[in-house]
Amino acid sequence: MTMQTDILTGRSAIGPALWRVRVLIGLVALHFLGVYTACLLLGHPFGSGTASTLISLLQVQIPLFLVILLFWRFGWMIVKIRPKRPTAWFANDLRETLLDRDRILTGIFAFLAMCLFAGSFTVGKDLIPLINPFSWDPTFAWLDRALHGGTDPWVLLYKITGTPAITTAINAAYHLWLMLAYFLIFVACFNVSRHDKHRRYLVADVLCWVIGGNILATLFASVGPVYYEAFGYGADFVPLMDTLRGFSEISPVWALDLQDMLLDGYLNDGPMRGISAMPSMHVASTVTMTLYAFSVSRAYGWIMTGFAALILMGSVQLGWHYAIDGYLSIALSLCCWALARRLLRAFA
């Protein structure tokens, strides 16, 4: 009888859990159908090697996230709670979290939705040159110079940050971005049932990637300074790339290997071939993370503001993007953050 009751209770909890993330699931489902339809129309297989790589990286990092959260909660207990019996309090807190059926179920559904979205997004990104061949780079390069007094932004930036050590540090922050993005998504998913700010972050993040990483990236198809010469636009950014290669002989510049891998994948139809510059999704997603951080704590928000500034610098410093890519991305993120709030209120 007890087992039967548990099963019925579990089933009754599934409906409310799905309902809490209905906006997120709806957006992901619409995006999935849109990309799948595009694949059918273009005769392109619905699959991407990038998606499997991203999911594999996430699987490896989940145990680390759990350890980080355990240490964070323990530190919170020591600094803020200060119970008379720390061990008993911590054990009880952990037990309550693990037995919170609504929280766990809602988190699982949200997390699965985000994983599905990662897959369909990367497929959509691979479709960009099939729908709209890359052509906007000369325009964006010209706009960059026009906005910065006739000089390429990377030249201005390198007057301040143009050393091998600083470039390595910025590159490290740029690579840390993926782990941080995964971590915040994981945290938000398993806190959705506790506060709307977590739900808002997930919805805003999906909107940002769909509108920016798929729709705008297709409309303004571009490859970025790093591939400017390879795609036949001229040697304008050869000095930038030569400088980075020179730096790499003194201090690591890991971006160069990834850039070569993506170009090789694009030219030879490899598993990793998602090239796209406008807008910068590194910048857009980091600004969204920053807005989320501010909704949790002003201190977290200012820390993330500094990180967002590093990502914006890195997008130009490492040759991935034109400065204008980042500027548009900031505006995009702010708009998606506001739109997420409206959507959640509309379907409240």
Label every PLM stretch briefly.
Residues 31-39, 209-215, 308-317:
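Aromatic-anchored segments of alpha-helical transmembrane domains
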Residues 94-173:
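Intramembrane catalytic core of multi-pass membrane enzymes that act on lipidic substrates
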Residues 36-49:
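Juxtamembrane "helix-exit" motif on the non-cytosolic side of transmembrane helices
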